């Protein structure tokens, strides 16, 4: 199974997500695509660390790796996730996108 992936437009609305995202976070495409990332799942994605990432860090760089976010989701419980993201520009239609992959590390233990 692939890691969950979500693609955002520059204004942080969801362009699309992969099947792994929908399964992992128990959401449907019709209630996700076109919505602002912070509004997803009754605002469950309005996470301070995610805001920091999208509003402060990403505008200053083109990508980041292993940005740790912890959050307690209503339907799936507490999750510890590593986010990787990059900004891309599609010249064909002059669209700026943000691609985010999410690795759930909740069950992993620190190696000693």
PLM regions with names:
Residues 66, 78-82, 97:
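Beta-strand residues that line the small-molecule/cofactor-binding core
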Residues 88-112:
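Sensory coupling linkers of modular signal transduction proteins
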Residues 70-72, 83-87, 101:
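PAS-family sensory domains
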Residues 11, 15-23, 35:
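PAS/LOV sensory domain surfaces, especially short acidic/polar patches at coil-to-helix junctions
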Residues 36-77:
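Terminal output helix/cap of sensory domains in signal transduction proteins
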Residues 4-5:
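Short hydrophobic secondary-structure edge segments in sensory/regulatory modules of signaling proteins
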């Amino acid at each position: 199974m692939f890691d969950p992936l979500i693609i955002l437009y520059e204004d942080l609305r969801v362009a699309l997500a992969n099947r792994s995202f929908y399964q992992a976070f128990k959401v449907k495409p019709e209630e996700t695509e076109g919505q602002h990332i912070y509004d997803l799942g009754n605002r469950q994605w309005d996470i301070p660390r995610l805001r920091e990432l999208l509003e402060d860090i990403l505008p200053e760089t083109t990508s980041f790796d292993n940005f740790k976010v912890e959050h307690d989701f209503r339907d799936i419980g507490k999750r510890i996730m590593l986010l990787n993201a990059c900004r891309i520009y599609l010249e064909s239609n002059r669209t700026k996108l943000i691609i985010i992959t999410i690795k759930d590390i909740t069950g992993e233990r620190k190696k000693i």
